[in-house]
């Protein structure tokens, strides 16, 4: 695994889904490539390969040989992508303008002035520049693919326009061929030119619409400053962001975006972290506090010591995750890819069959009809609509989720979320604030002076979230110092134990209390009932088999938890709560939230087993926790969801990360997944229906019934509209 790398490269010169398939097939054939996929909507190649066998330069060389190009240089890669997209759009715009300037008079001659002298020759002269100068890219693209034994949309456009033009050219210079047979020598120069004009117009609209699908990622990238001021040998200098190094001292002034992740080395201020945490209130930052790249300094100037720079910052990782998710393929896309891979050859076969049937059934009188119908079949067929149906919906859906602080790892996660019927919620840090405080102390007997010192020392070594509450409370008391423990051991799911001056001390749940055979007095038991019935957790502190104290710990329920549970139920999702707290505490919390099913006293293994049991019942389970603990349950769940709270830890362990502590993001995430998958199905349905209905009509299936024969010009307009309509439908999700 150490020699394997995964990279994403922008792809240039792709025109359709067939192009994406060609690039993908080319790269997959290279030695050392493990997996490769091309996203037509984002024009991105994602490839996993062995570094010892292959280099980005060699990948690019193979793609160039196939008629396309890659941007492999890491420096300013996104800027280059944007620049190339802008150039492509500008070129397309001028081609569209130029083509229509010639097409309009061509249509006038073909429809109104067809009987004036030299009308055919004038139409030919007007059509040639449209074919050569404005539509030349279709012909060169088709020729490159033909040399490789492949085909794409360029092939369809080049063949259809060439057939119409060459047929017209023959009729212009050899009209006697038809006159001798009692037939009229029709010309279709306008068809060849209008096809190119419409296809170019469609591609222009498609490019513009596709650009709008990446709005969310551009907003995220806009949070990255281009330059930073650093202190080098006591002198302040401005450098490009790419040249920052770990350990650099970075100067940030009021109103500026922070360029790195790091700690405040000097100064203090308030920082707007809403882009990551979702919290609108600026956070006070003092010396030693952590700050994140992309957040905004509100007030004073300060100096940061860089800890993570470039691609290692939380913001950069969020951007990379969103880009990778947008470029991933939904399960249904694998089927679509297979269809688009054979789409053009099948259409070519249908076009040939169409011409043969017309001539066979109708004889020489129907040669013109046969040619027109074959041209219409070639023109109306659209692999682009199929190729764009899934990725554009994914781009908009995942981008919208990111803008709402929901990070979805890939298309598979999005698809799985739609199927979830049970959500399992860990209590601490998910339903509650995750900032517990010690609210009550019950001492079983008179305290010895060192008891609190031992308790403080033991809890300072513990990683359990409740330990912090005890540490904070003890540190507020005077004269308490952590004892020098002889040993320390963490007991998974139960607590901790430590030795001090020949005695074994323990701190943890009532399960640890039982393990040490300690008992609770009647008086303490009565107080315990009151504490736990109010939703407080209980921590037991003892020495050997003697209970020394019970500490009541309160972790407030989040303000949005009850509403989130209600909304999930409205969506038809069952809710379960898991907690390591006792039965009374769990009952009190679940009752307040309206959760009927819960499991108390749950160890990590118990939580994993609970998820497994639900799955054995045929349920699709989503596990929601803080992204740090309960890794077993997360790994088992059909969908793993972590409450990230603005950290990068959760991004590594979950399929979905909620970047803020607001639990209302959870029902939003499920709703968005359903909307996105529904949109994908809509797009695919209309793309398939369009081709299933359009191709037979273009072939002339309605002609025997009502004499209707589809004009190639209308066929080209329909083809252009089909792909644009798919993209526009995807964009509608962003407005919901």
Predicted segment positions?
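Flexible metal-binding regulatory segments at protein termini and peripheral loops
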Residues: 1-118, 122, 219, 235, ...
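Conserved ATP-binding TGD loop and adjacent catalytic N/P-domain core of P-type ATPases
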Residues: 4, 21, 408, 500-502, ...
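Conserved cytosolic catalytic loops of P-type ATPases
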Residues: 31-53, 57, 189, 218-312, ...
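Actuator/coupling domain of P-type ATPases
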Residues: 57-75, 79-80, 120-123, 127-227, ...
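Bilayer-spanning, highly hydrophobic alpha-helical transmembrane segments
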Residues: 96-105, 334-362, 374-382, 387-392, ...
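Membrane-embedded alpha-helical bundles of multi-pass transporters
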Residues: 112-115, 147, 166, 400, ...
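Conserved catalytic phosphorylation-site environment of P-type ATPases
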Residues: 276, 372, 382-458, 614, ...
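Signature of the cytosolic headpiece of P-type E1-E2 ATPases
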Residues: 466, 475-588, 603
């Amino acid at each position: 695994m150490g020699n394997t790398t995964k990279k994403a490269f922008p792809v240039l010169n792709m025109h359709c889904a067939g192009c994406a398939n060609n690039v993908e097939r080319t790269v997959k054939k290279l030695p050392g490539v493990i997996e490769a996929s091309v996203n037509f909507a984002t024009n991105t190649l994602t490839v996993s390969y062995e570094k010892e066998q292959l280099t980005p330069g060699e990948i690019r060389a193979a793609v160039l040989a196939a008629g396309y190009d890659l941007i492999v240089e890491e420096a300013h890669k996104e800027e280059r992508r944007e620049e190339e997209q802008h150039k492509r759009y500008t070129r397309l715009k001028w081609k569209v303008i130029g083509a229509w300037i010639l097409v309009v008079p061509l249509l006038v001659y073909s429809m109104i002035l067809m009987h004036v002298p030299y009308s055919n020759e004038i139409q030919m002269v007007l059509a040639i520049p449209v074919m050569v100068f404005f539509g030349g890219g279709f012909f060169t693209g088709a020729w490159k693919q033909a040399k490789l034994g492949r085909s794409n949309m360029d092939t369809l456009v080049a063949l259809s326009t060439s057939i119409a033009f060459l047929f017209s050219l023959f009729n212009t210079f050899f009209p006697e061929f038809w006159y001798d047979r009692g037939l009229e020598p029709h010309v279709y120069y306008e068809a060849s030119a209008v096809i190119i004009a419409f296809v170019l117009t469609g591609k222009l609209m498609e490019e513009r619409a596709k650009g709008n699908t990446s709005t969310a990622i551009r907003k995220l990238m806009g949070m990255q400053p281009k330059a930073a001021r650093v202190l080098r040998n006591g002198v302040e200098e401005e450098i490009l962001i790419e040249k920052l190094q770990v350990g650099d001292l970075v100067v940030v002034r009021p109103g500026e975006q922070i360029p790195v992740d790091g700690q405040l080395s000097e100064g203090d201020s308030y920082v707007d972290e809403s882009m990551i945490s979702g919290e609108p209130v600026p956070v006070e930052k003092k010396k030693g506090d952590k700050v994140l790249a992309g957040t905004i300094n509100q007030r004073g100037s300060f100096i940061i010591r860089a800890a993570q720079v470039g691609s290692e910052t939380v913001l950069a990782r969020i951007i990379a995750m969103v880009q990778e998710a947008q470029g991933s393929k939904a399960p249904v896309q694998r089927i679509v890819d297979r269809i688009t891979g054979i789409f053009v050859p099948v259409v070519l076969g249908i076009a040939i069959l169409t011409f043969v049937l017309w001539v066979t059934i109708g004889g020489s009188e129907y040669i013109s009809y046969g040619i027109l119908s074959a041209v219409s079949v070639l023109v109306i067929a659209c692999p682009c609509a199929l190729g764009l149906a899934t990725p554009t919906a994914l781009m908009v859906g995942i981008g919208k989720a990111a803008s709402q602080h929901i990070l979805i790892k890939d298309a598979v996660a999005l698809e799985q979320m739609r199927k979830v019927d049970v959500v399992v919620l860990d209590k601490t840090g998910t339903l509650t604030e995750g900032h517990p405080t010690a609210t009550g102390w019950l001492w079983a007997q008179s305290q010895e002076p060192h008891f609190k010192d031992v308790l403080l020392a033991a809890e300072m070594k513990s990683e359990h979230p409740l330990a912090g509450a005890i540490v904070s409370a003890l540190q507020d008391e005077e004269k308490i110092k952590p004892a020098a423990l002889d040993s320390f051991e963490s007991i998974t799911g139960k607590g901790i134990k430590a030795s001090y001056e020949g005695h074994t001390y323990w701190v943890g749940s009532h399960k640890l209390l039982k393990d040490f055979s300690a008992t609770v007095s009647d008086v303490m038991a009565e107080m315990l009932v009151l504490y736990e019935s109010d939703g407080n957790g209980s921590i037991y502190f003892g020495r050997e088999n003697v209970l020394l104290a019970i500490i009541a710990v309160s972790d407030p329920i989040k303000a949005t938890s009850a509403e989130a549970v209600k909304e999930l139920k409205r969506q038809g999702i069952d809710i379960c709560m898991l907690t390591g707290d006792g039965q009374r505490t769990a009952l009190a919390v679940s009752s307040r939230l309206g959760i009927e099913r819960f499991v108390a006293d749950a160890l990590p293994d118990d939580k994993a087993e609970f998820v497994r049991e639900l799955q054995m019942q045929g349920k699709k389970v989503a596990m929601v926790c803080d992204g740090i603990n309960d890794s077993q349950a997360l790994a088992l769940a059909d969908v793993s969801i972590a409450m990230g709270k603005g950290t990068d830890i959760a991004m590594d362990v979950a399929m979905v990360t909620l970047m803020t502590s607001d639990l209302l993001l959870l029902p939003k995430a499920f709703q968005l997944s359903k909307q996105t998958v529904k949109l994908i199905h809509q797009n695919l349905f209309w793309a398939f229906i369009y081709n299933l209905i359009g191709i037979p009509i273009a072939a002339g299936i309605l002609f025997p019934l009502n004499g209707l024969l589809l004009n190639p010009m209308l066929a080209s307009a329909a083809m252009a509209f089909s792909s644009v309509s798919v993209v526009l439908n995807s964009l509608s999700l962003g407005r919901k």
